[in-house]
Amino acid sequence: MGKVIIINGSPRAPRSNSKEYGEIFSSYYKGQADTFNITKKNHKEICSKIEDYTDILLVFPLYADGLPVTVLNFLKVLEENPPKNKPKVSVIINCGFIEPEQNNVCIDMVKLFCKQNTYEFNSVLSIGGGEAILGTPFKIFVKWKIKN
């Protein structure tokens, strides 16, 4: 089992659904997983820690059919401050739309970042109805998908 750095890119990080999705992942992951919330001032700090991990898990909501500005700004700093050993990148993205396909353009943006910066893109979990699903009986399906 590798070490995973979970990076919460939600603008509402401390009280976000993205935080809860990251916590669900951590509860099932058998290796070491550490979580960091992106803020306006900690981009370089997070970038300096990334080389200690085998995997990055970006967790964030869809914003206006794209990445939240918090994630965009972080990726710019990461591009300028790459780690020596580049971990694999995975994504958990959620949107308020029922259809998870609404996330596809955003996922392609992360894949493009990975391709341009020689990170291996590993896996993605695209969640529709992300704002509401955690408060419903359907939460079990999300937990099952994250676990597997």
Regions found by a protein language model. Give the residues of each.
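Ser/Thr/Gly-rich flexible loops in soluble cytosolic domains mediating phosphotransfer, phosphorylation
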Residues: K84-V105
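Well-ordered, non-membrane alpha-helical segments in soluble/globular domains
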Residues: V71, N104-D108, K145-N148
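Short, histidine-centered active-site or binding-site loop motifs used for metal coordination
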Residues: N8-S10, I93-G96, G128
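Generic structural signal for well-ordered, non-membrane alpha-helical segments
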Residues: P14, S18, G22, N103, ...
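A hydrophobic alpha-helix/topogenic segment detector
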Residues: I98-P137
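Glycine-rich phosphate/pyrophosphate-binding loop and the adjoining helix
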Residues: M1, I127-N148
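N-terminal beta1-alpha1-beta2 submodule of the flavodoxin-like/Rossmannoid cofactor-binding fold
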Residues: M1-N85, K115-Q116
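Structural beta-sheet core signal
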Residues: I6, L58, V89-I93, S123
